[in-house]
Amino acid sequence: MSSFDKFLQNKILITTPKKELLIKLQLEHEEFYGLDSVKLANWVKGRSTPTLYKQLLIAQTCQCLPAYLDNFIEAKVSSSDERTFMKYINRIDSPYHQILASDNETYLFHQKGKYNELYPHVKPFSDKIVNLKKIAEKIRHRDIYAELLAIGTKDNKRSESFIWMLHGFDAYLDCMAHPGDKNEYSSQNCLAVTLTYYRSSEHFFLLCGIFANLMLERYPYKKKLVISFRGLEGLMLSEILGGQLIRSIPDSKYGNLYIHEFDVIRLFSNPLLLNIAKRYCHIYRDNFNRLISSPIKTSNLL
């Protein structure tokens, strides 16, 4: 459910007349080729509501995705998708997994920089997967821009949970001899989450909530988002999120990696992720700009 009509009335149409909005949507997105003034008027008056995907496209086109999240009311998730998602979450919260938990106070970090400078934070995890280690050795001297969202100790010498991001996936594809147009995966067009690890579901929701808001606020112009999912539960989750499999990386010990690509806006229009983005939008806005210079206690956020 969403009070999308109020969003159109109170945010979009304050600065953009209906006729101008209609033309802009038709010119920029093929999804709106069939949109006419009558259908748009029905959206504005609340007589009908576009899909979540089209809602996000409208918010993106008008550069007001944060305002859209403020207005958004959490959407219903199908029972089958909810079951698949909970299988993934339950794996994270397995008692066998929790034995790795630390009693130390944990902090949330966000770091940006060159790949070879930030990679040591995830190296202990990545190196355990032999094929990832080989790729890392091949690309460590390339000029790749990276970002790290992590939860760890105050000095950030030990990450307990993280999302590891690369701007561009073309270097990875070169290492895997993947055919096709590498420009689609350039730093300008693509962001890649090549490895994640979550010590608990609390960490998962916090990091994914921050990540979803980061993507929608700062990188909605990226054409592709590449994400690596590990294990059967990860593969099943990626499929219900609409991912297209690019490659799988076998690992019999730690679980196969399944690399999927997504359209950014279509991915985050999925109710599972859009609901998480909504729940964490205020935490993101209140704290994100401080994270680069000052880590924040997770106990103040969870």
Predicted feature descriptions by range:
Residues 52-68:
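DNA major-groove recognition helix of helix-turn-helix/homeodomain DNA-binding modules
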Residues 27-50:
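Recognition helix of helix-turn-helix/homeodomain-like DNA-binding domains
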Residues 1-28:
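A short, Lys/Arg-rich alpha-helix, primarily the initiator
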Residues 84-138:
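Short amphipathic alpha-helix that is part of the acyltransferase structural core
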Residues 219-301:
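Active-site/acyl-donor-binding loops of N-acyltransferases
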Residues 65, 74-86:
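Active-site-adjacent scaffolding segments
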Residues 139-154, 158-161, 168-171:
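A short helix-loop-beta-strand connector motif used in the catalytic cores of GNAT acetyltransferases and
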